[in-house]
Design a protein with these regions (language model features):
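Sequence context surrounding c-type heme c attachment/ligation sites in exported
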Residues: 24-60, 65-152
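Bacterial N-terminal signal peptides
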Residues: 8-16
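Bacterial N-terminal signal peptides that target proteins for export
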Residues: 1-9
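Acidic, low-complexity intrinsically disordered regions
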Residues: 4, 17, 93-96
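Sec/Tat signal peptide C-region and signal peptidase I cleavage site
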Residues: 17-24
């Protein structure tokens, strides 16, 4: 094998290991919610790159990302947090269950704001309007993580 091919093979292997280690042996409902959060994060990053000008702006892709985020939010997200599901490597704070109405409110707000982002992108709304909707949605993620995610 050529040295350059070997380096690419090693790099690809390390990259794949990083993804596997990211969930550090999570199983069951903890893995399901970590996978859902990873999917949300991937879509948020995709839209963020477009709105920052680091990737070509594509309203169809933004609408698709909004739909994907909405699909993981609201009741779907809430069901991923049954009481006593703090098995390692969960990053969920026990305060979720003490402040359930606030937590579920964030989940519902994420769904609503992601649906709004999707709708605006589908309608061909001005990029600044889409960016404002994205900012609101991302702000919901940030607020929820600050309140209910254990800091690494």
């Amino acid at each position: 094998m050529k040295p350059s091919h070997l380096l690419w093979t090693i790099a690809a292997g390390i990259s794949g290991l990083g993804a596997a280690w990211a969930h550090g042996g999570a199983t069951g409902i903890v893995k399901e919610r970590m996978d859902a959060m990873t999917e949300i994060s991937r879509n948020v990053k995709l839209v963020g790159q477009m709105l920052k000008g680091n990737a070509a702006y594509d309203g169809v892709e933004i609408a698709r990302a909004g739909q994907a985020i909405a699909a993981h939010a609201g009741d779907t997200m809430i069901k991923l947090f049954p009481e006593d599901s703090l098995n390692a490597p969960s990053e969920a704070s026990p305060s979720i269950w003490n402040e359930w109405s606030q937590f579920s409110g964030y989940a519902d707000s994420l769904r609503t704001s992601a649906q709004s982002l999707k709708g605006l992108a589908e309608q061909g709304a001005d990029q600044k309007v889409v960016a404002a909707a994205f900012g609101k949605m991302a702000g919901t993620c940030k607020a929820c993580h600050e309140a209910f995610r254990i800091k690494k």
